[in-house]
Amino acid sequence: MTTATDGSADGRLRVLVLGSTGSIGTQALEVIAANPDRFEVVGLAAGGSNLDTLLRQRAETGVTEIAIADERAAQLAGDIAYQGPDAVTRLVEETEADVVLNALVGALGLRPTLAALASGARLALANKESLVAGGPLVLQAAQPGQIVPVDSEHSALAQCLRAGTPDEVAKLVLTASGGPFRGWSAADLQEVTPEQAGAHPTWSMGPMNTLNSASLVNKGLELIETHLLFGIPYERIEVVVHPQSIVHSMVTFVDGSTIAQASPPDMKLPISLALGWPRRVPGAARYCDFSQAQTWEFEPLDDEVFPAVELARHAGETGGCMTAVYNAANEEAAAAFLAGRISFPAIVGTIADVLHAADQWAVSPANVDDVLDAQRWARQRAQRAIAKASPAGACEKVSGLA
């Protein structure tokens, strides 16, 4: 059973890294390696698609508690303690840790998230999909302050909110880089290729997060996550485009003050803060250099060309399992785009199609099975939409719902 304590016998925090071979996981291991007096790795988990990286991590960290979800990959690796679809969850349940970093990709992170919360460990959450999909279940399972966000935007909000009391908050402002297609027209987006969508202008991320950032679905997920993490109504959460990605989010208070968190785009800063919260890790990232001339731009998000955020707001305000439906529909549509089956705008068009038909899921889930049922339905509905998707039809569906 994972147990949250003040750390190991030597005072270091014991960290379990889920999704260790991905972008967040590899950077987290670099942060841990650079601060051996603060952190130690006690377990690693990965899907198994990047086996060479996982084996190298095992050798570098010396850990023996390892989970691989893909059984074939686990057999190739040899001497893997936890194998199969439930391997990651069992690793969380049976490994003593103070911090569980969930950097898994997709809604498969839900059960490990719930297991980490049940253990009492601090959850450093990078797997936004588990919170978006699990919503009420995750919040019910969490103790106050147990979840610390890893996303740069939510890490920024957590820092800014320390400047006032909850009743003094007027609104939260999420910033978005705008992605690689900022300023493009809807017609331009019809010709986007997977290669173009995989090139983010300011951040280095995994392929799924990069695609979600290009479609602005990522910002939609972050909008939902913001509401769930901080309890602020959707109408008091704004999204603005900030191409430089220096200001990561802002909080406006009732007296008119706006507090912003600014730093060069580097995920090691929010990762280090989530691992060591509330203590900061010296040297985690570069400072802003104000001795050099800079221009920071802010502009409104074009909801007509990029309707993913407003669709997420619709799903969140509707409630129930609708955010799980939003996420599952996106996962199916994104995979179809990467496979060349649909156009780039049809990703969000597919989400809109699925949400149009999802009234039955506007009921709060009683358990994980309810969430999984909603996601299963959404994936099936998304596949039907994908099969008949056309760019024109997709745009019409989005316009009808947003």
Swiss-Prot record:
Binding site for NADPH: 21-24, 47, 50, 127, 129, 206
Residues where Mn(2+) binds: 151, 153, 222
Annotated keywords: Isoprene biosynthesis, Manganese, Metal-binding, NADP, Oxidoreductase
Keyword Ribosomal protein: no
EC number assigned by the record: 1.1.1.267
SUPFAM superfamilies for this protein: 1-deoxy-D-xylulose-5-phosphate reductoisomerase, C-terminal domain, Glyceraldehyde-3-phosphate dehydrogenase-like, C-terminal domain, NAD(P)-binding Rossmann-fold domains
Gene Ontology molecular function: 1-deoxy-D-xylulose-5-phosphate reductoisomerase activity; manganese ion binding; NADPH binding
Top-level class of the enzyme under EC nomenclature: oxidoreductase
Catalytic activity annotation: 2-C-methyl-D-erythritol 4-phosphate + NADP(+) = 1-deoxy-D-xylulose 5-phosphate + NADPH + H(+)
Highest taxon in the source lineage: Bacteria
Pathway in which this enzyme or protein is active: Isoprenoid biosynthesis; isopentenyl diphosphate biosynthesis via DXP pathway; isopentenyl diphosphate from 1-deoxy-D-xylulose 5-phosphate: step 1/6
Pfam annotation, one family: DXP_redisom_C
InterPro entries reported in the protein's UniProt record: DXP_reductoisomerase (IPR003821), DXP_reductoisomerase_C (IPR013644), DXP_reductoisomerase_N (IPR013512), DXPR_C (IPR026877), DXPR_C_sf (IPR036169), NAD(P)-bd_dom_sf (IPR036291)
Gene Ontology biological-process annotations: isopentenyl diphosphate biosynthetic process, methylerythritol 4-phosphate pathway involved in terpenoid biosynthetic process
Cofactor(s) required for function per UniProt: Mg(2+); Mn(2+)
Amino acids binding 1-deoxy-D-xylulose 5-phosphate: 128, 152-153, 177, 200, 213, 218-219, 222
Function: Catalyzes the NADPH-dependent rearrangement and reduction of 1-deoxy-D-xylulose-5-phosphate (DXP) to 2-C-methyl-D-erythritol 4-phosphate (MEP).
Entry's family note: Belongs to the DXR family.
Protein known as: 1-deoxy-D-xylulose 5-phosphate reductoisomerase
Gene field: dxr
